[in-house]
Curated annotation (Swiss-Prot):
Main location: membrane
Protein name: Spermidine/putrescine import ATP-binding protein PotA
Chain's role: Part of the ABC transporter complex PotABCD involved in spermidine/putrescine import. Responsible for energy coupling to the transport system.
GO cellular component, as recorded: ATP-binding cassette (ABC) transporter complex
EC number: 7.6.2.11
Superkingdom assignment: Bacteria
Domain ABC transporter: 15-334
């Protein structure tokens, strides 16, 4: 246990998910998910409805139990701990505010349960804790050895027992649940120590301390003029601030946010996005944020985990995911895209749209003559004059032009019946003939995705 903790601190990982599997009855919701989150990061779990992103959040928060795998918090497996024993807080989609309490009452609620260190701890209690830790450690080690023996014994029995028999099922069930048995004893000493300290080393907050803490957090989130208001009198944005204040006031290591901005209108949502990022950076907290909104994820996150059907397709910075998606699914899910079937050629070239183009890729990534997917983002395409000296111009005809405020989104038909989309500040008339061009680093090549339905074409 000590080694795991040391490794986690060294890596600065506050959360580590290791081979997490989650099943609801016979349905596999999470399939061997591995994820590490560093202390102070803003990490977004991004995916469509039903992808498993909220399930991951609920597992970290303790609202669901993993079927298999480990959930490590500062190096200790906590998957069997209840939510109140984890040093984190959660903001739900519906805010879960108490309607019978005013703003101040909602915010201070958690402080009534909070404990802070006593100024003076009796020496006899310190000595008693040292003796207790020794006893608890010996007990945990003894129980872990017993688990090791049982696991080896049951695994050997399964080799000879007939599948489907009562004894086989019983042994298999024990082995399937063994992660939780090990997890309990791995964190046993820490949990007993925390219980002891809460009783003898800590005290409740005084009324003066509570009032001071509430005033501080109220000012931080901009609610100083709304302390005495009823929850029913607040706008959606103000309710969001109350939920945030209530979560932050207990000083958690991690804040979990389950699509907290989805119910807000566009303008308030944009303001709250900026506000959340400012708060996170100011307090240097770890935020784990769930959303299906790609723009929101790109704007807020230090790293994004893109989730598809219970698996993490890509985990990286917003720039890396947008510019260098791992496959066609990620490319289409994140932002607008033009994706074409292509063939990788020698000398870092690609055959695309019946022409050869230079790329930044090499033969360490793809085999010569390998079929690949080629991505070109609409904003990376230039519309040029026929006479302009640009290598490998593509000729096309504009079939649609949509004004989107700061740019026009143009659909161009190519001679081989392909279509390509372009973002440009200049408008062009429908049926106008144009020439398209792009730079060498605008073409991003990806391995073919075995799970993608290429016949469907659309996302």
């Amino acid at each position: 246990m000590q080694n795991n903790t040391t490794k986690s601190v060294k890596n600065n990982n506050v959360i580590e998910l290791i081979d997490i599997v989650k099943q609801f009855d016979e349905k596999l919701v999470l399939d061997n998910v591995n994820l590490n989150i560093k202390r102070g990061e803003f990490v977004t779990l991004l995916g469509p409805s039903g992808s498993g992103k909220t399930t991951i959040l609920r597992l970290i928060g303790g609202f669901e139990w993993a079927t298999r795998g480990e959930i490590k918090f500062n190096g200790v497996d906590i998957k069997d701990l209840s939510p109140h024993k984890r040093n984190l807080s959660t903001i739900f989609q519906d805010y879960a505010l108490f309607p019978h309490l005013n703003v101040e009452g909602n915010i201070m609620y958690g402080l009534k349960l909070k404990r802070v260190p006593k100024e003076n701890v009796k020496k006899e209690h310190k000595n008693l804790l040292e003796r207790k830790i020794k006893v608890w450690t010996e007990k945990a080690q003894r129980e872990m050895k017993n688990l090791d023996k049982l696991q080896e014994e049951y695994e050997n029995e399964l080799k000879v027992l007939k599948p489907g028999t009562y004894k086989h099922q019983k042994r298999q069930t024990w082995l399937d649940d063994s992660d939780f048995k090990y997890s309990y004893w791995e964190s046993y000493v820490l949990q007993k120590t925390e219980e002891f300290k809460n009783k003898y080393f800590k005290r409740k907050l005084t009324k003066e301390e509570i009032d001071q803490t509430v005033d501080k957090i109220v000012n931080l989130v901009g609610l100083q003029n709304n302390k005495n208001k009823k929850i029913t009198e607040l706008s959606g944005g103000m309710k969001q601030r109350v939920a945030l204040a209530r979560s932050l006031i207990i000083e958690p290591e991690i804040l979990l946010l389950d699509e907290p901005l989805s119910a807000l209108d566009a303008k308030i949502r944009e303001k709250m996005q900026v506000f959340l990022k400012q708060i996170q950076q100011e307090l240097k907290l770890t935020f784990i944020f769930v959303t299906h909104d790609q723009d929101e994820a790109l704007e807020l996150s230090d790293r994004i985990a893109v989730i598809r059907e219970g698996k993490i397709e890509q985990y990286d910075t917003p720039k890396q995911i947008y510019d260098y998606p791992r496959n066609i699914w990620v490319a289409k899910f994140i932002g607008n895209s033009n994706i074409f079937n292509a063939k990788f050629l020698k000398d870092s070239k690609v055959e695309l749209l019946n022409k050869e183009f230079k790329t930044i890729h090499d033969e360490d990534e793809f085999a010569v003559d390998e079929e690949v997917d080629a991505l070109i983002r609409p904003e990376d395409i230039d519309i040029v004059n026929q006479t302009q000296n640009t290598e490998h111009k593509i000729k096309g005809k504009i079939v649609e032009s949509i004004y989107r405020g700061s740019y026009y989104y143009i659909k161009v038909e190519l001679k081989d019946s392909n279509y390509i989309f372009v973002e440009t500040a200049k408008n062009f008339a429908v049926d106008e003939t144009v020439y398209l061009s792009w730079t060498i680093d605008s073409i991003h090549l990806m391995k073919k995705d075995p799970k993608w339905d290429y016949a469907k074409k659309d996302f």
